[in-house]
């Protein structure tokens, strides 16, 4: 690994993508900016899961959560406090070039998983986020803690598209009809049972942290208005929402009578309907593991909605947030997650793209920066703020590998952008990884520093 030079708080220029001509300079706190913190010292020994071995609480054989004083922790199966330093989409692309590179360098998927999990451990990571190659991970003689994502709404969405002709006339960026989640449809319940029941295969595995259900479901602020004004009056969703509205406002109430208080109350009912369905099936098939939520992501909608977080706290063990549009997490915003829900949170997506990567970087929600070194500074700045909050129990960088830019079958928002820790051919970005390692190797000491212990 390269030696990381000592630097204090710095300025880093960033922009949304290469189509934005101007750059903005952001204050960026690095590890070396922590006054009095001894950067040369690393964390004490970790247990096999990556937990803080020097401290012990009740061991249940599975991952759980616990608040100790004013700080939240994940507690690993051996009873040690654990911060989930993870990587999303720990998997290999499907293009011919990527598969050839896999065979040349690792021979098999199992060989790749063994080698790259060891690489991640050397970098101070201790877990794997959504969309990872779970089958290969579980076959390893030395696996890493991992997560599983099941997608009942995502699967039902495909059927719903076919039902309404394959293309919606009005839809948001996730391509949901009228930007509404179909939580009230009786057909959705069938997909909940089919998809969520799959968790039974993992219920006894101590290496599993927990489950996500779906990703970035649209929870628009005016969902009540849209249900009552855009849906046909014989649709199950309209009938369910009209019944709720009548009970709240009276049968003579009209959509024009909707207030912001009504919208907030409905958003709670709307989310509760989804979460009550998925968690009932989840707990039936696996009572042992954590429920990590449905990956909230919209600042103008659910991430500022107190009523929705209050509901989330009743069902989720940890609130998952895909965190974009903020260079540094806003301390009031992220502590509100815990204040409103009574639960800790985890950042399940965040990243920057380096314009020195030879990729166009025209898509994706993460920031563009000039260099891989600056990607590493962003990582330190972002994670330091999360650790200081005391209510964040981990983060998952998005993602392990750049897509092959020649593979036209990949998701458009990922295709041409430098989101990975390694290139499409497994070649690492050392300047980024060195700075990730510098923070990851000192996480528990950083927590002691922030907690004044």
Predicted regions and their residues:
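Polysaccharide-binding and catalytic clefts of secreted carbohydrate-active enzymes
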Residues: 77, 174-186, 194, 204-307
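Glycoside hydrolase catalytic-domain groove-lining segments
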Residues: 256, 265-280, 284-364, 384
């Amino acid at each position: 690994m390269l030696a990381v030079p000592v630097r204090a708080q710095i300025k880093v220029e960033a922009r949304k993508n290469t189509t934005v001509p101007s750059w903005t300079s952001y204050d960026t706190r690095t590890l070396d900016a922590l006054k009095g913190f001894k950067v040369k010292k690393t964390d004490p020994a970790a247990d096999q899961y990556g937990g803080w071995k020097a401290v012990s609480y009740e061991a249940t054989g599975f991952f759980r959560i616990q608040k100790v004083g004013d700080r939240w922790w994940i507690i690993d199966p051996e009873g040690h406090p654990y911060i989930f330093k993870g990587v999303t989409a720990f998997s290999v692309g499907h293009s011919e070039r990527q598969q050839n590179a896999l065979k040349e360098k690792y021979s098999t998927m199992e060989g790749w998983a063994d080698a790259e999990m060891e690489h991640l451990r050397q970098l101070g990571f201790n877990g794997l986020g959504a969309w990872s190659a779970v089958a290969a991970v579980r076959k390893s003689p030395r696996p890493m803690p991992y997560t599983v994502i099941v997608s009942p709404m995502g699967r039902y969405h495909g059927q719903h598209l076919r039902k309404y002709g394959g293309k919606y006339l009005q839809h948001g960026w996730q391509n949901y009809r009228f930007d509404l989640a179909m939580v009230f449809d009786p057909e959705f319940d069938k997909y909940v049972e089919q998809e969520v029941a799959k968790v039974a295969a993992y219920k006894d595995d101590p290496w599993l942290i927990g489950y996500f259900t779906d990703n970035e479901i649209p929870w628009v602020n005016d969902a009540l208005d849209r249900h009552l004004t855009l849906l046909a009056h014989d649709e199950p969703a309209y009938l369910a929402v009209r019944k709720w509205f009548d009970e709240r406002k009276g049968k003579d109430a009209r959509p024009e009578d909707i207030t912001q208080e009504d919208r907030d109350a409905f958003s709670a009912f709307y989310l509760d309907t989804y979460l009550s369905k998925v968690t009932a099936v989840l707990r039936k098939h696996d009572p042992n593991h954590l429920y990590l939520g449905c990956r909230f992501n919209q600042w103008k909608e659910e991430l500022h909605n107190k009523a929705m977080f209050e509901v989330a706290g009743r069902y989720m063990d940890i609130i998952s947030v895909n965190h974009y549009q903020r260079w540094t997490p806003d301390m009031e915003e992220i502590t509100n997650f815990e204040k409103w829900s009574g639960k800790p949170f985890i950042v399940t997506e965040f990243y920057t793209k380096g314009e020195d990567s030879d990729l166009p970087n025209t898509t994706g929600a993460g920031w563009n920066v000039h260099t891989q070194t600056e990607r590493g500074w962003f990582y330190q700045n972002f994670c330091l703020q999360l650790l200081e909050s005391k209510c964040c129990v981990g983060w998952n960088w998005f993602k392990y590998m750049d897509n092959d830019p020649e593979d036209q079958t990949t998701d458009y928002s990922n295709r041409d952008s430098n989101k990975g820790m390694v290139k499409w051919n497994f070649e690492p970005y050392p300047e980024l990884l060195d700075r990730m390692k510098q923070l990851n190797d000192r996480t528990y000491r950083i927590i002691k520093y922030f907690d004044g212990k």
